[in-house]
Amino acid sequence: MALFALKSFDTPAALEGLKPFADKMPPVLCLSNGVSNEPAIAEALGNDKVIYGTVTSAIGRRGAGDIVLERLRGVGIAKGHVLSEKLNKELNHAYLNSQLFEDANSMKWSKMLTNLIANPTSAILDMTAGEVFANKDLYKLEMEMLRECLAVMEAQGLEVVNLPGTPVRALALATKLPLWLSRPLLGRAAGTGRGGKMPSFHIDLHSGRGQSEVEYLHGAVVRAGEEFNVPTPVNKVLTETLVALTNKEIPLEEFAHKPEKLLSKVQNN
């Protein structure tokens, strides 16, 4: 078995390199974030070569080849592949807290829901997730962003499922609660859920990487919304703004520590 855990923007190039060896490739367990990687792998290598997976544990990178497990939550494996149950068993033998899921897409979209939180907002505004949630108006923006994703999931007939160590259904429920009730709970989760790291979009943008997964996460919400006639204005503005910053079409200082500017852009969209 091969393990596929790349950033989504690296997937196309990686698959181009693997295509000539498709008939020799073993099944691929895909742990990448987003909802487009497994279909791309299936198209390049064959439907029988891909196993849908997800990781909820928090991992930190201290240097090249040096990683640390910051918080053990677990691994999700979708049923449907001949190796799914055996793989789940072996992962549990390794104490990785693996769990099988009936529906691959519900599992992947539920994981993506958790990846959306404070991710582009943190990068665009150069603020921590905790700082984003501490701002009442930004918190409202985060909730609306999540509601859009949930509406898109519902339109596709997908279910929100809890993932290992990650109560995703509680996150979905929080979008229906009064802000005064949900905000303290999610604010604490936002500050601790990623271990000691800044959100991934912030890391990529402020390291000058020149690429962002926002097109594969929030952008995926926008594209699915267009397909299923579900409005996604917040996700659209966040995607377009972060892409523009990543491509250096606008300077980082344009929105840095200026939440009112981002909020105004969303309201005027």
What are these regions (language model features)?
Residues 1-66:
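Rossmann-like NAD(P)(H) cofactor-binding subdomain of soluble oxidoreductases
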